């Protein structure tokens, strides 16, 4: 496994739409493993492949309930509304309140190619939406309702 360089805001790759994964092979598995290692090293809760310069629909997330690896994730259902703080490993030091669904259902492939669905609520719903937005070339700052100052940031981790 290897630590990947996290692309920062201003890098054009962050604004490009990622392409679907058509074959799950050892290269894709290595990318997922590298992404997870990179996310953990940087104390994040999620990372999309384009954040490490790879335009493929790959996401890793860990909101404290174990690592999720999602290949070709898509939101198939959303419900409710929540407004909460977000940050991003690609936009260090910037945080803001973003409106997201309270609950989402996401369909994806696992590393064996099996179709799976996961229902996420609260922080997991927020992380899923944030990372899937990345795959569309959308950053959380595009959706910020209000930027947060240092006094309001206690306990906020970068997604």
From Swiss-Prot:
Cofactor: Fe(2+)
Residues given in the record as Fe cation binding sites: 88, 130, 134
Binding note for cofactor: Binds 1 Fe(2+) ion.
Top-level division of the source organism's lineage: Bacteria
Active-site residue list: 131
Keyword Iron appears in the UniProt entry: yes
EC number in record: 3.5.1.88
GO terms (BP aspect): co-translational protein modification; translation
Transmembrane segments: none
GO molecular function: metal ion binding; peptide deformylase activity
Record carries keyword Hydrolase: yes
InterPro entries: Peptide_deformylase, Peptide_deformylase_sf
Keywords of the record: Hydrolase, Iron, Metal-binding, Protein biosynthesis
Pfam families xref list: Pep_deformylase
Catalytic activity: N-terminal N-formyl-L-methionyl-[peptide] + H2O = N-terminal L-methionyl-[peptide] + formate
Cited NCBIfam families: pept_deformyl (TIGR00079), PRK00150.1-3 (NF001159)
Family (UniProt): Belongs to the polypeptide deformylase family.
General function of this protein: Removes the formyl group from the N-terminal Met of newly synthesized proteins. Requires at least a dipeptide for an efficient rate of reaction. N-terminal L-methionine is a prerequisite for activity but the enzyme has broad specificity at other positions.
Name of the protein: Peptide deformylase
Biological source species: Caldanaerobacter subterraneus subsp. tengcongensis (strain DSM 15242 / JCM 11007 / NBRC 100824 / MB4)
């Amino acid at each position: 496994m290897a630590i990947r360089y996290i692309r920062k805001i201003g890098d054009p790759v962050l604004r490009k739409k990622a392409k679907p994964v058509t074959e799950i092979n050892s290269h894709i598995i290595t990318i997922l493993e590298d992404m997870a290692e990179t996310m953990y090293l940087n104390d994040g809760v999620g990372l999309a492949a384009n954040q490490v310069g790879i335009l493929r629909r790959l996401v890793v997330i860990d909101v404290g309930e174990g690592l999720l690896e999602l290949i070709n994730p898509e939101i198939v259902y959303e419900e409710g509304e929540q407004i909460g703080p977000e940050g991003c490993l690609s936009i260090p030091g910037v945080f803001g309140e973003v409106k997201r669904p309270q609950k989402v259902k996401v369909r994806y492939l696992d590393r064996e190619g099996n179709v799976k669905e996961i229902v996420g609520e609260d922080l997991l719903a927020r992380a899923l939406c944030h990372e899937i937005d990345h795959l569309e070339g959308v950053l959380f700052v595009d959706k910020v309702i209000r930027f947060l100052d240092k006094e309001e940031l206690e306990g906020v981790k970068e997604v």
